Design a protein with these regions (language model features):
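Conserved alpha/beta-domain cores
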Residues: 1-184, 190-192
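C-terminal active-site rim and adjoining tail of enzyme catalytic domains
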Residues: 165, 199-201
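Conserved N-terminal glycine/acidic-rich loop preference
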Residues: 196
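Expand to "…catalyze enediolate/carbanion chemistry for C-C bond making/breaking, isomerization
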Residues: 190-191, 201-205
């Protein structure tokens, strides 16, 4: 565990999601004892295996519609809402549980064909459509920036996200989360307005 980094992160005024994929329950407990208690999982099965209600959980990986029923009611935030079909299923399951599910809309800001997310240019229209769902609360937007040595490109992606976030925040009072930045680029993301970072190996190793 990187105790020094954990202490440094706790002192900051942004939220930290400790990405716990491939980590054991023991490692999660150890990080929690050091003061970080929000964890992010990529895969539903792994989340179910590790779920502990005393911690806060985010799903941050691509989410299949048929897996939604296993996580609604347990997960605090679904950070990877990227389609209307997925929104409909989250709405259905949240309604069944009698809860309002917090979500972030994942936007595809990178040109990388392997990245998932709703097309960035259509984000406003999509978020407007999502307002019809009574059991979904849109808390903000999320992205995974390009994995590249080109810092200017990454900064440009973060800046576009931040500009959109500020515009959405004015329009929708519930929106308060801009989730961007991981182990390799979180400092850059925070510089460009991120208030939630998702850090895995830098914390756990």
């Amino acid at each position: 565990m990187n105790k020094e980094l954990i202490e440094e992160l706790k002192a900051q005024d942004f939220n930290v999601v400790a990405v716990s994929k491939m980590r054991t329950k023991e490692e999660i407990d150890e990080v929690a004892k050091m003061g970080l208690t929000t964890f992010g999982e990529n895969r539903v099965q792994e989340f179910i295996d590790k779920y502990d209600p005393k911690y806060t959980w985010h799903i941050i990986g691509h989410l299949q519609t048929n897996k939604v029923k296993y996580i609604v009611g347990k997960v605090d935030v679904i950070e990877s809402l990227d389609s209307l079909k997925l929104a409909e299923e989250i709405e259905k399951q949240a309604n069944k549980h009698g809860i309002i599910q917090k979500v972030l809309v994942e936007l595809k800001i990178s040109e990388d064909p392997n990245k998932t997310g709703y097309p960035f240019k259509d984000a406003k229209n999509f978020i407007s459509q999502l307002q019809e769902f009574k059991h979904i609360q849109i808390k903000g937007i999320m992205c995974v920036a390009s994995k590249t040595e080109d810092q200017a490109l990454v900064e440009s992606e973060f800046e576009q996200m931040h500009t959109l976030y500020l515009e959405l925040k004015e329009q929708y009072p519930d929106i308060d989360t801009l989730s961007m930045g991981m182990s390799q680029d979180y400092k850059l993301a925070v510089k460009h307005g991120s208030n939630t970072v998702r850090i895995g190996h830098a914390i756990f190793e």
